[in-house]
Structure formats: structure tokens, C-alpha cells
């Protein structure tokens, strides 16, 4: 191995356990969607599982990361789903690829709009009446201190996320009813963040003199310091949202 690996330990690109993923797939396929749209899909693991559970459905994944999309295409081929899914390397802003019966937007609302209310309005536009939206969105368990914010991501601010009650309220204001509200556990966060860095940490231990080692080490150390700071402070909500139909 001569270059740092990327995300090979991750099944999902977020704090999502296998049991929760199974529950989400079961809930999101209850209304038998025939079209699925995945915003900021990455390698689209959750969408592929939904397609496998709903043989009549087709899916579209949108992302700007070519490497992640290639991983998604390989996974689709391995599962015999190639003819039912397409992966598009493009921006999701103003996307014409809707409406869909099921819209997934997990950790990717910023791909639709800069502010959460506008992103929620876009999700309402992109989902069919009687469809579902799965929104995976960050929230604060408590307001972080200035010292904590300084150790998180660059220019982190207490206004970067709402609290959970405010988040759900924004979804209601955008024309949804919350069918189900759940949040990632601390175990899910620790599994995700550890898997996110695991291969890189092993590579750094085995290649300390590599030309890329210094910058890779600095990046890994910065990310670890950030997540150990927002651990227990930053949450991720999984909201299953039902659009309110026009009267």
C-alpha cells in the first residue's frame, strides 16, 4: 500500500448501524416507492438496500465525488441492480430529477441549499404527494462552548445546527409531518468516526516516512481532535417525513 486508503472500513458514510439501517429500509419501503432519489448519495449503500427490498423501484443517486460514485456503481453491479439505478456526477442544487416517491438526504442538505429552511423546501418539491423523505441532519444536543467550537471544524459556529426540537419544527414549517424521529447513538458515532480514520491510522503507523505522511497525519489528527470534541455534543437525527398534501 503506497498511498493512504479512503473509507474502506465504512459501510455507510455516517453514524448508522446495521440494525437501524434495517429498520429504516423496512419503514421506507412500506409505501412501496417506485422511484428513489438520493441527494449527496456517496456510494448510496442505503439506496441500494432499499432497491433490493423493492424490486419494482428504480433509483437515482446524485453526488459530486466521482470516487464515491464509482464505488456505488461497483456495488450495484455486484448486487444485480445496475439496470435499476443510475449515478449522476453533478450538483444537486436545483436538480430536475424529481419528484420521487422516496427522497433520501442524509447529511447532505447543504447540497440543496445553503440554509436548512430552503433545503427543506427543496425536499418538499422533490417528493411526490404521499411519498416519504428521509432527512439525516445534524443538531446540537446542547449549545457548544466557544472553546469547543474552536476545536471543531473551521469557522464552527453555534448557529451551524439547531437543537432537535427546532429541527423538527423547521420540517413541519416546510410542509411535512414527522412520521418517525430517531437519533444516532453514541455507539454509532464512535463506530463511524473510528472506521472513518482506521485505515489511515494503520497506514500512518506503517509508512511514517512516506512523502504524504506529514500532511496525512496532520489531517487525521485534526479530524480526530474535532470529533472527540463534538462527541456527545453534535447529534444526527434521522427524520422520516411525510409531505402534507394540498387541500
Predicted features and spans:
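Conserved class I S-adenosyl-L-methionine
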Residues: 33-42
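Short, glycine-/aromatic-enriched active-site segment of Class I SAM-dependent methyltransferases
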Residues: 138-158
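Conserved Class I S-adenosyl-L-methionine
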Residues: 182-247
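Class I SAM-dependent methyltransferase SAM/SAH-binding core
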Residues: 45-93
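A short acidic, Gly/Pro-enriched loop at the edge of an enzyme's catalytic core
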Residues: 93-103
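A short glycine-rich, Lys/Arg-flanked "PGG" loop and its adjoining helix->strand segment in the class I
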Residues: 117-132
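A short SAM/SAH-binding and catalytic strip from SAM-dependent methyltransferases
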Residues: 101-115
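Conserved alpha-helix/loop element of class I SAM-dependent methyltransferases that forms part
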Residues: 14-32
